A protein has these predicted regions:
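Active-site cofactor/cluster-binding pocket
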Residues: 1-164
Length: 164
């Protein structure tokens, strides 16, 4: 089983991103479950969401405390929240940022890093700083665990196509 924890701020689509990635993984024949975390979050407040996927049925529907991968859709979040808490040694970080690797906050447990200037791309393409779908593409490129075609199909054939 592979576990992903999404970090973002309210309104950035971290919860939606987990659902979109689950749909793409299902499209490729995997078992996947996204687990939103709701509380008293408001727009701009830190939020988390979770995703598990496997070749076998998934029965565990709890929060993820020791993820294999972190997807952070907000480039400033690591300054105020310990996004690396519990990351497995050698884990993967997929981070939205316009900074070079040397200037990005990266914990010692991180083994693989994927960076994406998602805000600039989103502003150019969508005219809004909606980075969640771009970060899924960065996840696909960084890990190779889902194809861009599956991501595209899951977005085109679902309710997510109207989300931004």
């Amino acid at each position: 089983m592979y576990e992903v924890r999404f970090h973002g701020r309210g309104g950035q689509g971290a919860v939606t991103a987990a659902s979109m990635l689950a749909a793409a993984l299902l499209e490729e024949g995997k078992y996947a479950v996204s687990i939103p975390s709701f509380g008293f979050e408001r727009r701009g407040a830190p939020v988390v969401s979770f995703l598990r996927f496997s070749d076998r049925e998934i029965r565990q529907l709890t929060n993820i405390y020791t993820p294999d991968c972190l997807i952070c859709v907000d480039p400033t979040l690591a300054k105020s929240v310990d996004i690396f808490s519990g990351l497995k040694p050698g884990g993967t970080l997929v981070q939205a940022t316009n900074k070079p690797l040397e200037q990005v906050i990266i914990a010692d447990t991180v083994g693989v890093v994927g960076l994406c200037d998602a805000i600039a791309i989103a502003l150019e393409v969508f005219k809004r700083p909606i980075t969640n779908t771009l970060m899924l593409g960065a996840f696909a490129k960084t890990t190779g665990m889902v194809s861009l075609d599956a991501l595209r199909r899951s977005l085109e054939d679902s309710d997510f196509r109207d989300a931004g």
